[in-house]
Amino acid sequence: MAAQKINEGLEHLAKAEKYLKTGFLKWKPDYDSAASEYGKAAVAFKNAKQFEQAKDACLKEAVAHENNRALFHAAKAYEQAGMMLKEMQKLPEAVQLIEKASMMYLENGTPDTAAMALERAGKLIENVDPEKAVQLYQQTANVFENEERLRQAVELLGKASRLLVRGRRFDEAAISIQKEKNIYKEIENYPTCYKKTIAQVLVHLHRNDYVAAERCVRESYSIPGFNGSEDCAALEQLLEGYDQQDQDQVAEVCNSPLFKYMDNDYAKLGLSLVVPGGGVKKKAAAPPQAKPEGTAAPAAEEEEDEYAGGLC
C-alpha cells in the first residue's frame, strides 16, 4: 500500500514538472495545473507516511500558487508543509512555516484564517518553547482585536498570561492580565474582571510589589459590583495579612475555595505566596517564669531588669 502511494506521488510530481516546462509553442508555465499536481503528490506521500517528501511537495505547491498570484492557496500549502514538519517532530521549523502562512492570509484579507493558523502554531510549540507560544498567542489576540472580535482576543490573551505566570515572568504577566481585564470590562463581563483582579494581586505580590497590588484593588472599586463582592473582601483580607506579615491569614485566604478553584497557574501562586520575612506573625511574649535563687538570668533579661523600676 505504501509503495503504491509513493509511486502515485512520484507520478504526480512528474506531471507537475511537465506543466512547468516551456517550449516553442508554450511560452508560460501552467502554474495552476502544476500546483494541483504537487498537492496531489503531497497527499499521496502523506498517506504513505513519507512526510519529508510530502513537505517538499507542499512547498513546491506553495511556490506554484505564489507564481500564479493565488496567495490564499499558497498560504494553505505552506501551512500543510508546516503540519508535515510537525509529524516529523520538527516543531520550530513547523511554526516558522505556519507563521509565514498566517502573514499571507493577512495579506490576502482573510484575518480569521490567519488567527486560527497562529493559534494552531502556538499550541504546537507551547510545551517546547513557551516564550514563542506567548508571542504567537499575543499576535493572534491582536488580529482578533483588530477585527473587533474581543471575546476571541481575550481568550488568547488569557493563554499568554498563564504561560507567562508559569514561566515566572511576572512583570510581563501583570501587563498581560491588565489587558485581559480591560477587555472584560469593555464587554461588561464584570465577574471575570473580579477574578482577573485576584490574579493581578497574586502576580504583584510575587513581584514583591505591595503598592501595585493595593492599587489594583483600589482601581477595581470602580467596576460595578466589585465593592462588597466576596472577591473584594478576600483581597482586602489578603492584603491586610500580607502587610502585617501574617502568614496564617494569607494562607487562610489563599486556601479558600475562591482562590483554590481559579486556573491552576493562579491557584499555585496563591498556595506558594509567602509574606515578607517568610514567617508567621509574631505572637505575644509569654509572661516570665519565676526562677530559683542562684540561677543566672540571660543577659537580655538583666538589661531589662536594669530599667524595671523606671529611669531615675
From Swiss-Prot:
Transmembrane segments: none
Chief place of localization: membrane
GO CC annotation: Golgi apparatus; SNARE complex
A Pfam family that the UniProt record links to this protein: SNAP
InterPro entries, alphabetized: NSF_attach, TPR-like_helical_dom_sf
Annotated Low complexity bias: 285-299
Biased composition regions of type Acidic residues, renumbered to the chain: 300-312
Gene3D superfamilies tied to this protein: Tetratricopeptide repeat domain
Secretion signal, residue range per the UniProt entry: none
UniProt keyword annotations, A-Z: ER-Golgi transport, Golgi apparatus, Membrane, Protein transport, Transport
Subcellular location: Membrane; Golgi apparatus
Region annotation (Disordered) ranges: 281-312
Membrane topology (UniProt): Peripheral membrane protein
GO biological process, one term: intracellular protein transport
GO molecular function, one term: syntaxin binding
Main function: Required for vesicular transport between the endoplasmic reticulum and the Golgi apparatus.
Family affiliation: Belongs to the SNAP family.
Subunit structure: Interacts with RAB11FIP5. Interacts with VTI1A.
Name of the protein this chain belongs to: Gamma-soluble NSF attachment protein
Source organism: Bos taurus (Bovine)
Gene it is expressed from: NAPG
